Amino acid sequence: MEHQGTGIFHLGAPFLLKVKQWVGWSWTYLWGFWFLLVIFLLYILRAPLRLKENMNLVILFLNTLTPKFYVALTGTSSFISGIILIFEWWYFRKYGTSFIEHISLAHLGPLIGGGDNTAPNSSQNVAECKVWRNPMNLFRGAEYSRYLWVTGREPLTYYDMNLSAQDHQTFFTCDADETSSNSADTIMLTAWRERDQEKRINAACRAYECDPTSPTALILLAEEKAQTITEAEWYLKQALKTSDDLIRNGASTNGDGKEDTIHRKNTNVCVYIRRRLAMCARKLGRTKEAIKMMRDLMKEFPLMSVLNIHENLIEALLEVQAYSEVQQVLAKYDDITLPKSATICYTAALLKARAVCDKFSPEVAAKRGLSPAEMAAVEAIHRAVEFNPHVPKYLLEQKSLILPPEHILKRGDSEAVAYAFYHLPHWKQVEGAINLLHCTWEGTFRLVPYPLEKGHLFHPYPGCTENADRELLPVHHQLSVYPKKELPFFILFTAGLCSFTALLALLTHQFPEPMAHLAKTSLGWISAPFSLLIQKVEDFFPAHILHQLTRI
């Protein structure tokens, strides 16, 4: 019996689902036919229902009403509409959506729309707003501080610098520093926790005086005290000598927990120094040297892929226009199992666009259609724009750039700023790439009409990016928000209805006779098509058929 009940339930569920879908379909497409059918039945049954007599009574009642009644009626409706408008506006400001629209979509939509009840995995619906270290972050002393001196604007937020302080404590300190025989390690343990920049630099100077070969002290001086990239490179080269010795001496650890901790710290320090040295070489124009250093670093420390050194390599390869080598890097890192980034997606789009953009013409494409290569380029652009929709406005120079933050949010405005800051010249040096992007990027939004609910090639766009980007980007930057929060239709409709009825009430109160004449004229215009339709129906059907129908 239990199995039979289960079988009946499984057989009944598809039937009920089909009935529900049929009802939803009928409400979607047949409401017009039903409306005409009701009008036709009312016309046929006008004699039994005494519609003409009842209509005359209604007209007589309306004729006895004074203008003051209409003023009171419109005033009351305006008052009610105003209350609805205020409530809708409060609800929209608090929850970001219209109350009426929310109720319609959440409760009425499933009843009459026949929507799909299958809910995807919550882990795919809710994207975690994870903050990542910017692989292309600048030097504070040589770049960020100079920007502050020139403009008087803070390039970094407190939240961003606080995240960097946490990263520095993770990379450059360990528990063994508290009991280290080297006083420089103890001083730097305190220096990395210091929030004030001047105090950090002073602490690093004291550690440098105690031990001129302290790698972490030299790193802090290179990052924050050095006023030029050349000076920062000098500090880092001094730190690398000691760091390499520490790595070689600690390679043969006997498995002791303390020694392993120190070795992990020394490894982090060595990787960081070599990476920053490669970035210094890139900034000073020695791009080929920087490429070699990055390749060696990725080869020697493959487990450090979490630092996204490949993004530094891609940018350097684009600088020397080594597009085939860039394609090889993308083939390795543009994998479905690896986290995506704006650098990966937009570089793939740039390489696809490079093959066709020099001969691309929107007029010609509109006439003959897109070739397979052009279609592949457009699809790559759409894929990149879906991943991060903020980037195109920076590449098209519709928004001004600022210095990139030290941390970015994937798919957010902070990542777009960080990407465009370095890659805008690479798009410009490919002739026609900017033009192709300009002609095609907005087509992405037709593929993703509801980005917060459902994506096309990626998960739905996370709704938490706006708040996180506001914490990462400075106040003077105009934040790019996606999708744009436009006022819902119900709020606009309510506001228009409220304003229109209030205007009618005012005009009726000031000019009662002209407004009454205008109302009668308007009603005559509105009823004229219906009167003509009724006359056509009476002419079409024979009189005896209508007479027999009224006798039913």
UniProtKB/Swiss-Prot annotation:
Look up and give the membrane topology term: Multi-pass membrane protein
Single GO cellular component term = membrane
Transmembrane region(s):
25-45, 69-89, 487-507
Key words of the record: Membrane, Transmembrane, Transmembrane helix
Chief localisation class = membrane
* InterPro entries assigned to the protein according to its UniProt record, in alphabetical order: ST7 (IPR007311), TPR-like_helical_dom_sf (IPR011990)
Q: Where in the cell is it found?
A: Membrane
Q: Which family does it belong to?
A: Belongs to the ST7 family.
Q: Please identify the protein, giving its name as recorded.
A: Protein ST7 homolog
Q: What species is given as this protein's source?
A: Nematostella vectensis
